């Protein structure tokens, strides 16, 4: 069985003319294909969204959206295991072929101009939603990596608004990703001052500013829970928004670093 979706994507692009940056509305084509085999669910995408985006490049995100070659497969019949796998790169793929990459490549670095860098203290990883300017995230909670890849860090607002179903995509272990507005994670912000690392209150700048207390056991620490009797992941309005760990066997295709 094979599904092929070719959807027109309207994106804002920017060009530089005589030193002035101007914006124009350009029409690009989103190409996304999902194929089912006996045991795998595979995706092909050119990385272009099927909805409007923010303006890129810009001061807070100097990268331009460009075509990508995304070719990934996950298990068609995922199984939940007893321990989870921490995700620091690609977590999943949306139903329009755009990847979910909730983490950043930034860590606390007191010697860096913005107090964080790629070579900082790995014990304190930056959460994009805790940063001023959010590294240029647009209204879809997405921005562009150095390689031109447009990717989601949170709820893909325009994609969700175009659909009347809760299914948003698939995780790297094959489980479904859903969004239901009332779902809340069991993660909360710590109180008081940090005992080490960056000086100051726990304010959400770093992922380590949060801890998991559970939410009446509805969602686990990976934002996973039951929907109609089956285990799925949820995107939530509160931290971590997009799951940072997975409870199934993660496909090797999702271990590749994409920035």
Model-derived regions, located:
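Solvent-exposed N-terminal domain segments of exported/luminal and surface proteins
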Residues: 21-134
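Long, compositionally biased interface segments
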Residues: 200-259
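Short helix-loop boundary/capping segments
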Residues: 153-203
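Extracellular/lumenal glycan-associated surfaces
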Residues: 95-101, 146-160, 227-240
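Short, flexible domain-boundary/linker segments around small modular repeats
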Residues: 104-141, 186-221
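Hydrophobic h-region of N-terminal signal peptides that target proteins for export
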Residues: 9-18
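Sec-dependent signal peptide recognition
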Residues: 2-10
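Extracellular structured ligand-interaction cores
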Residues: 69-71, 90, 137, 147-151, ...
């Amino acid at each position: 069985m094979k599904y092929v979706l070719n959807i027109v994507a309207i994106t804002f692009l920017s060009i530089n003319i005589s030193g002035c940056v101007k914006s124009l509305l350009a029409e690009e084509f989103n190409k996304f294909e999902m194929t089912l085999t006996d045991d795998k669910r595979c995706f092909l995408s050119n990385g272009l969204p099927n909805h409007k985006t923010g303006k890129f490049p810009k001061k807070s995100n100097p990268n331009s959206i460009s075509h990508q070659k995304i070719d990934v497969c996950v298990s068609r019949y995922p199984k939940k295991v007893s321990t989870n796998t921490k995700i620091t790169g690609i977590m999943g793929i949306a139903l329009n072929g755009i990847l979910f990459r909730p983490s950043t490549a930034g860590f606390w670095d007191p010697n860096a101009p913005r107090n964080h860098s790629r070579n900082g203290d790995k014990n304190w990883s930056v959460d994009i939603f805790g940063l001023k300017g959010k590294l240029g995230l647009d209204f879809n909670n997405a921005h562009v990596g150095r390689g031109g890849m447009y990717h989601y860090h949170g709820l893909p607002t325009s994609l969700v608004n175009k659909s009347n179903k809760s299914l948003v995509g698939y995780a790297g272990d094959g489980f479904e990703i859903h969004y239901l507005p009332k779902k809340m994670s069991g993660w909360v912000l710590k109180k008081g001052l940090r005992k080490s690392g960056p000086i100051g209150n726990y304010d959400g700048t770093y992922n380590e500013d949060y801890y998991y207390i559970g939410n009446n056991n509805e969602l686990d620490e990976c934002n996973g829970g039951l929907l109609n009797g089956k285990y799925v992941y949820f995107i939530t309005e509160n931290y971590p928004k997009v799951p940072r760990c997975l409870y199934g066997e993660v496909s090797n295709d999702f271990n590749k670093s994409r920035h």
